[in-house]
């Protein structure tokens, strides 16, 4: 009889332990159900790149003076600059300019050291191709401006992944009912413009007040 009660007690203890572990697992599941989504449904949704994002290089042919500074500062001597010397003007004439993005490491040295600012980094990062030779962009392909994520009608940009509110270090701490994590870049610009306008109004009013005090 004592053995029977011992078996019942052990079975009950095991059942309670199993239920506790089951509830712990469900608690983790329910905790993640209330969190904000992190996964991006690419390519239907895209994150907005940062302001200084180093994407595909944009090239302006008319500004280039064929100085080849970009070639000298490139860690792998990647840009190919084809030019000839004009004997009449004694100046370089640019014929062709190309960059192979299959080899480029996007360090941004060429953009930083260009004396005429003919090179700039764009927000374009979709450079996948079936043929690696198609990644060798000439001056015509480099001159095309990319389509911005914020203006592309076929893409829903995730604007809620902007700046976090003050004193918030974890995006999951933001309530799910809130539409986004922080201010949008457009709202930040509007706030800066409004602040600049207020400063100008205050300065003009102070100047008028000083002029009124003069005899």
Curated annotation (Swiss-Prot):
Binds 2 [4Fe-4S] clusters per subunit. Residues 55-84, 95-124 form the 4Fe-4S ferredoxin-type domain. Its main location: membrane. It is found in: Cellular thylakoid membrane. InterPro entries: 4Fe4S_Fe-S-bd, 4Fe4S_Fe_S_CS, NADH_quinone_OxRdtase_chainI, NDHI. The keyword Cytoplasm does not apply. It is an enzyme of class 7 (translocase). One of its GO terms (biological process) is photosynthesis, light reaction. It catalyses: a plastoquinone + NADH + (n+1) H(+)(in) = a plastoquinol + NAD(+) + n H(+)(out); a plastoquinone + NADPH + (n+1) H(+)(in) = a plastoquinol + NADP(+) + n H(+)(out). PROSITE patterns: 4FE4S_FER_1, 4FE4S_FER_2. Keywords: 4Fe-4S, Iron, Iron-sulfur, Membrane, Metal-binding, NAD, NADP, Plastoquinone, Quinone, Repeat, Thylakoid, Translocase. [4Fe-4S] cluster 1 binds at residues 64, 67, 70, 114. Its EC number is 7.1.1.-. [4Fe-4S] cluster 2 binds at residues 74, 104, 107, 110. One of its GO terms (cellular component) is plasma membrane-derived thylakoid membrane. GO terms for molecular function: 4 iron, 4 sulfur cluster binding; iron ion binding; NADH dehydrogenase (ubiquinone) activity; quinone binding. It is a peripheral membrane protein. NDH-1 shuttles electrons from an unknown electron donor, via FMN and iron-sulfur (Fe-S) centers, to quinones in the respiratory and/or the photosynthetic chain. The immediate electron acceptor for the enzyme in this species is believed to be plastoquinone. Couples the redox reaction to proton translocation, and thus conserves the redox energy in a proton gradient. NDH-1 is composed of at least 11 different subunits. This is NAD(P)H-quinone oxidoreductase subunit I. It comes from Prochlorococcus marinus (strain MIT 9211). The gene is ndhI.
């Amino acid at each position: 009889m004592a053995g029977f009660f011992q078996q019942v007690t052990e079975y009950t203890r095991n059942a309670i332990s199993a239920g506790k572990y089951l509830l712990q697992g469900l608690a983790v599941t329910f905790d993640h159900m209330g969190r904000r989504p992190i996964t991006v449904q690419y390519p239907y949704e895209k994150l907005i790149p940062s302001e200084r994002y180093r994407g595909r290089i944009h090239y302006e042919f008319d500004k280039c003076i064929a100085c080849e500074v970009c070639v000298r500062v490139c860690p792998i001597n990647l840009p190919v600059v084809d030019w000839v010397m004009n004997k009449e003007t004694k100046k370089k004439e640019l014929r062709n300019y190309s960059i192979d993005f299959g080899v480029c490491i996007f360090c941004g040295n060429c953009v930083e050291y260009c004396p005429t600012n003919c090179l700039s980094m764009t927000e374009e990062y979709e450079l996948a191709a079936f043929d690696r030779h198609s990644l060798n962009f000439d001056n015509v392909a480099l001159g095309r401006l990319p389509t911005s994520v914020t203006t592309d009608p076929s893409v829903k940009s995730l604007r809620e992944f902007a700046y976090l509110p003050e004193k918030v270090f974890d995006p999951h701490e933001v309530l799910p009912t809130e539409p986004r994590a922080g201010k949008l870049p457009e709202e930040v610009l509007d706030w800066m413009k409004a602040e600049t306008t207020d400063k100008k109004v205050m300065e003009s009013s102070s100047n008028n007040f000083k002029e009124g005090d003069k005899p």
